[in-house]
């Protein structure tokens, strides 16, 4: 064991995957946040880009069923059900690894527009007595709607629902400018797996350290991205594989560094309705690496 440590090797007991050189259970997560990524059988990757903090910004509007469509949502439930389940899934995913989030600063912020008091009370009830910081903010619609071109890229009038959505996106980017490190922008119709947040943090550290660059992570593996033949790079995260993509919707994780670098491009989605809506994001992904998990985390 002493010789293995000197030469940087790990010993694994094949009968139970115990790692005596590190005194770890290989069946659990042997990686150490901010220090090393340990993947069986690939070995150790030193973390040169540690995650210092994570801000999760959830945009909610429990009163609007579908933003730009008239059809019903899957399962045909009230929109508030999707908003509440999204928040519940995020808090459950965070609590799935409290040890990880005790080592980095974590905050959950909700920017809400037009949800009734009953739903807001339920948001606060879910966030009450959690070990991480949280707050529920009201969308400043008057401030941000003034900055929106009311005629979209197709020459049509922008709908009221879209104006509130674009304003919410703008406010979330303004908040992100004052965050510490990573920011996860989330729409209120994504149900997260228990290991979703943990995987995104460990994958970001590992892949960013290997490539020596900042990243954009999308938690979903969108089926529509398989409709065309495109080259894709595949990376090993913590427990999932990740592949490079050039399109996302408005739910993604990235760093404050990239937000500041492309702030005008990011906020252009909240000033002009493009087609597709996320086109400015896609232009950024032509210059920066965006990856998504296989299979999806949310």
What does each of the following model-derived ranges do?
Residues 2-92, 99-101:
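N-proximal low-complexity "stem/linker" segments adjacent to membrane-targeting elements
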Residues 112-180:
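Active-site-proximal specificity loops/subdomain of glycosyltransferases
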Residues 54-69, 112-113, 136-146, 219-222, ...:
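Short loop/turn segments at strand-loop or loop-helix junctions that form parts
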Residues 93-103, 129, 175, 204-212:
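Alpha-helix termini
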Residues 149-152, 162, 176, 182, ...:
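Conserved catalytic core of nucleotide-sugar-dependent glycosyltransferases
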Residues 76-87, 160-169, 192-196, 273:
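Phosphate/oxyanion-binding active-site loops and adjacent basic polyanion-contact surfaces
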Residues 18-30, 256-298:
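C-terminal catalytic/acceptor-binding lobe
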